[in-house]
Amino acid sequence: MFYPEQFDVIIIGGGHAGTEAAMAAARMGRQTLLLTHNIDTLGQMSCNPAIGGIGKGHLVKEIDALGGLMATAIDHAGIQFRILNASKGPAVRATRAQADRVLYRQAVRTALENQPNLMIFQQPVEDLIVENDRVVGAVTQMGLKFRAKAVVLTVGTFLDGKIHIGLENYSGGRAGDPPSISLSQRLRELPLRVNRLKTGTPPRIDARSIDFSVLAPQHGDTPIPVFSFMGNAGQHPEQMACYITYTNEKTHDVIRNNLDRSPMYAGIIEGIGPRYCPSIEDKVMRFADRNAHQIFLEPEGLTSNEIYPNGISTSLPFDVQMQIVRSMEGMQNARIIRPGYAIEYDFFDPRDLKPTLESKFIQGLFFAGQINGTTGYEEAAAQGLLAGLNAGRYANEDEGWSPRRDQAYLGVLVDDLSTLGTKEPYRMFTSRAEYRLMLREDNADLRLTEKGRELGLVDDARWARFSEKLEHIEQERQRLRDIWMHPHAENVEQVNALLKAPLSREANGEELLRRPEMDYTQLTSVAAFAPPLADTQAAEQVEIQVKYEGYIARQQEEIEKQQRNENTVLPLDLDYQQVSGLSNEVIAKLNDHKPNSIGQASRISGITPAAISILLIWLKKQGLLRRSA
């Protein structure tokens, strides 16, 4: 039977991608349905209890700048906050938080259940309703049919999921959850390229069985960082320490002696695992010269005895897992309460997607998260937000939107996936972005909140705070420009005490702040430049904008040059066989990738500058040379 109500957007899956997609579509005013196999696992952290990190924290800030959920949820659930790369430049500084799993899940579910225009329904989805290459709905396990104008697939590792522990394996979406077999088979019938990937998780340890007295603690930062631009440290729950231990030669011997019992080394697992989060078996074999690997013992929550040993993901048999765990310092009597495992699952080639994350072959069908070949909560959530907002725009017959590479790490992520695809689980790093200086955590709102408001994602409270911050930044920069200090002024000694060499010429506040030895706090401690801004976010922006002004201006020039190619549109139905002068290799790659723009085409491996020139000349001759806004 058909459900009596028709929806604008259906989201299939309630993980990190699905929850952000559902919130985004609903915030835009679209009637949204979130279908999940279990309402109690909405926002579940299936692997590590943490949010953020290098590159990942940048994505979380961007999600927040666009009105998303993840940063707010972790501010209410984070039990340890740290700034990584704090001693380095602002472009690569990143926030990371340990999470209380229960509090995080509660924060996500509360937000979903209080979001207008959003309905949640518990039923596994087994089929899509596709008519004339357009998706128009979904069918659940009980045969209930839901109609919608757009559908977003955010099914994580559930598609034909297979869990491996040693040489034994069984079907599962993750430990304790069934896989999605019927939907996987249905999707394989569509004109989409599909492959298999693998990921894994470590065994969980009973904290009461660990001797923490012999281990080094790792505490969070003081003052405690905050993730959301709308957040404050008062929202954080009680803070906890992590602890550090190490593998050793005994650990490595156990692993080497049991490789024949590893499903990966025995050839049972076909899927490729994440390069930057390898299993402990992989680490020991790939880095044979290392006699120890650092392992972080991370608490899973304030009310839980579970410890997540970050760094020993494994699919070795349980008896070997016990030997590995007990070989490490402080863990000699450790008890495993959940075994580690590897999971294989279907993913679909993201080169078959537009930059909006809509399928090139099935209209109205969007993909987000691990189904696109990514790994990580943050990567999934960022894609979910983008897919949800574009599904909402599609349902309203509006043009889709995707950020450029110079606008957001989300733009880098989507461009990498849709242009290059991936053969292994894709993880975000700051090194993937050409314009890192522009794409900092601290300015995510300055880059994206205005666009989020235009798209209908940003509410009045966030917009008011953002507008106030902009005003504070401009007013403070103008104030500093207007205050001058002369070498012979009465209070010049206060300034000279902060400088490497005494002031030799008249300088205003911005010029003094630009000096490497001067920071904003020091400058505003001088009576002439006091008082400092009470708005600490705005104060941080003032310092960064002033100190890096020259570098930022140069990077902006590079972006403007590149933008010409990015804005030159390529028709998706163009047959590159028609373009005389292109080599067979180039023709094959362009027909395979179907790039959206000259800029995207230029990033495809094997596409030469000469080929781009030929293409531009041909487009001009054919009257097809046009640039998007």
From Swiss-Prot:
It holds the Pfam family SAM_GIDA_C. GO terms for molecular function: flavin adenine dinucleotide binding. NAD-binding protein involved in the addition of a carboxymethylaminomethyl (cmnm) group at the wobble position (U34) of certain tRNAs, forming tRNA-cmnm(5)s(2)U34. GO terms for cellular component: cytosol. HAMAP family: MnmG_GidA (MF_00129). PROSITE patterns: GIDA_1 (PS01280), GIDA_2 (PS01281). One of its GO terms (biological process) is tRNA methylation. Homodimer. Heterotetramer of two MnmE and two MnmG subunits. It comes from Serratia proteamaculans (strain 568). NAD(+) binds at residues 273-287. Its cofactor is FAD. Belongs to the MnmG family. SUPFAM superfamilies: FAD/NAD(P)-binding domain. FAD binds at residues 13-18, 125, 180, 370. Gene3D superfamilies: FAD/NAD(P)-binding domain, GidA associated domain, C-terminal subdomain, tRNA uridine 5-carboxymethylaminomethyl modification enzyme MnmG/GidA. It is found in: Cytoplasm. This is tRNA uridine 5-carboxymethylaminomethyl modification enzyme MnmG. Keywords: Cytoplasm, FAD, Flavoprotein, NAD, tRNA processing.
